[in-house]
Amino acid sequence: MSRRGPEEEACGVWLDAAALKRQKMQTHLLKLGTKMLTLLPGERKPSIPFTQRRATRQTSITSFVTSQPGMANGGNQKNASSLKENQINRECKSRSQLDCLDQGLEDDCLVSPLATSTPADIREAGHSPQSSQISGCQSLETTSLTMMSFPQPVVLMGTGESKAPLASSFTQFLERSCLLDQREAKRKREGLCGSKTDCPGMGSHIRPPGGKCHQPLDKAKVEKRATAKENRQAPVHLQTYRFGSHSGKKTLLVTKSPCPLSVFSWDIDRKDRDSWSQLFTEDSQGHQVIAHSTKMPFQDVTNARNQGSGQFPDSPQAQGQDGPTLLHLQPHLLFTQDSEGNRVIRH
């Protein structure tokens, strides 16, 4: 047999039984009655002991992590409630620190005192009685809003304590936000008023409470503005009818505007229909055609002239002199006959 080269020997996997026997092996458990994570040789113990009793049933991950040997189910519940309380306290502390930072940054913001604060605390904080009254009113308003909009504090399971510090910090935050909104609205109003008073083109300005108005009024500008307002605000002319009953009698109360609108009447519609029927008629075949009056006899006036003026009837001079009376008195000037004897409009 040919001997394998060193390259082929390096590719194989060789197990040394003596080396395997020399490895350390875990022969016994660290604590009786517990199930620990198996540790490799040379590894440290875990910081959190993942233990579980024999007689207890695992219902949540918190009981598995925090339970220790010697505690029952009641102890697990107490540990869970204590963890929740600690978490709530940490959140309250962090929020109070943020509130302190907000107070340091925003010196102009008025902070309302709490309901538990005493007058001595208010004086030490530097609040005057008037400011404390104002802030107290504002705090009452905001707290009433928060009480109406939010439910009662939730009671923790297994304990009789409530989330009172969390609710109080939340109400404080709402109060500060409301006060900031009020101050921003006041600043905007003051800015608008200042822009109105500083405008040079304004004819009239707001008079100060303790001084006189020294800016002259431009009458022409005031009149122009008044006329523009009148033009923009077009009056609505309406007629209102009210029926009132007094002592058993019905009375009609009519209020009219100075320029009443034209009231629609059915007579106008009837007149239009009559005129429409006079203009059009039906022929022998049932088609709608223009109606021609047959009062005047048919005359051929193609080459006829106006006897009084000696002009053609179609000339603008004749029409301007006589006007519509010429057309009404002489209808034969409007109509003529064609080659078949039918009456047609004169062209």
Swiss-Prot record:
Phosphoserine sites (modified residues): S284
Endpoints of the signal sequence: none
Classification via InterPro entries: AUNIP (IPR029286)
GO biological process, one term: double-strand break repair via homologous recombination
Region annotated Interaction with RBBP8/CtIP, chain positions: 273-347
GO molecular function: damaged DNA binding
Region annotation (Disordered) ranges: 301-325
Domain of life: Eukaryota
Record keywords: Chromosome, Cytoplasm, Cytoskeleton, DNA damage, DNA repair, DNA-binding, Nucleus, Phosphoprotein
Subcellular location: Nucleus; Chromosome; Cytoplasm, Cytoskeleton, Microtubule organizing center, Centrosome; Cytoplasm, Cytoskeleton, Spindle pole
Polar residues: bias regions: 301-322
Subunit structure, interactors included: Interacts (via C-terminus) with AURKA (via C-terminus). Interacts (via N-terminus) with NIN; this interaction blocks NIN phosphorylation by both AURKA and GSK3B. Identified in a complex with NIN and AURKA. Interacts with RBBP8/CtIP.
Task performed by this protein: DNA-binding protein that accumulates at DNA double-strand breaks (DSBs) following DNA damage and promotes DNA resection and homologous recombination. Serves as a sensor of DNA damage: binds DNA with a strong preference for DNA substrates that mimic structures generated at stalled replication forks, and anchors RBBP8/CtIP to DSB sites to promote DNA end resection and ensuing homologous recombination repair. Inhibits non-homologous end joining (NHEJ). Required for the dynamic movement of AURKA at the centrosomes and spindle apparatus during the cell cycle.
Protein name: Aurora kinase A- and ninein-interacting protein
Organism ancestry: Eukaryota, Metazoa, Chordata, Craniata, Vertebrata
